[in-house]
UniProtKB/Swiss-Prot annotation:
Family note: Belongs to the succinate/malate CoA ligase beta subunit family.
NCBIfam families: PRK00696.1, sucCoAbeta
Gene3D superfamilies reported in the protein's UniProt record: ATP-grasp fold, A domain, ATP-grasp fold, B domain, Succinyl-CoA synthetase domains
Function: Succinyl-CoA synthetase functions in the citric acid cycle (TCA), coupling the hydrolysis of succinyl-CoA to the synthesis of either ATP or GTP and thus represents the only step of substrate-level phosphorylation in the TCA. The beta subunit provides nucleotide specificity of the enzyme and binds the substrate succinate, while the binding sites for coenzyme A and phosphate are found in the alpha subunit.
GO BP, one annotated term: succinyl-CoA metabolic process
One GO MF term attached to the UniProt entry: succinate-CoA ligase (GDP-forming) activity
Organism: Xanthomonas axonopodis pv. citri (strain 306)
Protein name, UniProt field: Succinate--CoA ligase [ADP-forming] subunit beta
Major enzyme class: ligase
Amino acid sequence: MNFHEYQSKQLLAEYGIPVPAGKVAATPDEAVEVANSLGNGPWMVKAQIHAGGRGKAGGVKFCKTTDDVKAAAAKMLGTKMSTYQTAGVELPINLVLVTTAGEIVKELYLSILVDRGTKTITYIASSEGGVEIEQVAAETPELIHALNVDFVEGVQGYHGRDFGFKLGLNAKQAGQFASIMVNLYKLFNEKDLALVEINPLAILDDGNLYALDGKFDSDDNAAFRQKQLVAMRDKTQEDETEVTASELDINYVTMDGNIGCMVNGAGLAMATMDVIKLNGGEPANFLDVGGGANKQRVIEAFKLILSSDKVEGIFVNIFGGIVRCDMIAEGIIAAVKEVGVKVPVVVRLEGTNVEEGKQLLRDSGMAIIPADNINDGAKKVVEAVKNAA
């Protein structure tokens, strides 16, 4: 789950990490009220969407007067914005964040994440903040510093001070940096986060460090014990079909192709998409219907797939281990009838009660195309889509 900047800053502040004073507003007049409550300007007005790159897209404005604040908020609120991170998708701007604006002396980068390669929690820091860290890594990798945290020792103050001196900070600032690192480690663990990125972590004209922007990503598997984070979810920033799928507890990800996939098991689902690609097709989605699939679940999965008007064919690839193939077949037949499927449907069944499942499909009288294996199914669905075009 992703978070808005204002939500990230709220969490950072709760854990003692300095952030500029600010508050969100839903209307231009509210934005002016917030600005006045923060004292004399200048201020920053920032569009709240689940994406970076807002500045280049016109979503971050420096304002010297409250008239500027009102104009900036009016221009953003109620509109949609796309950035280089949204892949052309426009996200609605329902809120703006109004903050104080100090003069930036230096921009740094700091993040904490789970490094699967080293199997540790890892800090990444750089003296080059305010830009994409991938760009820094590619052009000046010597400016990137990493720390793999020992699970027994945890992160200590001396780790932060050492990092701070590597980034060119003075003794006072290195001490602040150490405090931020220690508090960030506590936040990361207590909130079951997968990533926290502060970019930039800036030195302002008062000589102190502030988190000017924050990007969070949480571990959805821990949502059951993170009620505060779940309450922060903004479904307006998410793909509508993916939101519906999450409410049905179906693992679904929208993609750009035209061949819908319904599979049980994440590994088999990824393999299915790969084989479709190898046969010249383009998957329209990742959909893991799960090991506990039943007839109604299969119907809902078909509805999810067909909610996209880009889908021109469907490949159902089921390995019946926990789930029974005959039950899946019943769900497919019911779904085709209920949903009114008008695109080619290719079905590959294997495993428990496979013969019963295949017989049900044959007896249904429906134009369901059987497949013997995953490659055969991928070839047939790609061919069926081409022939139907």
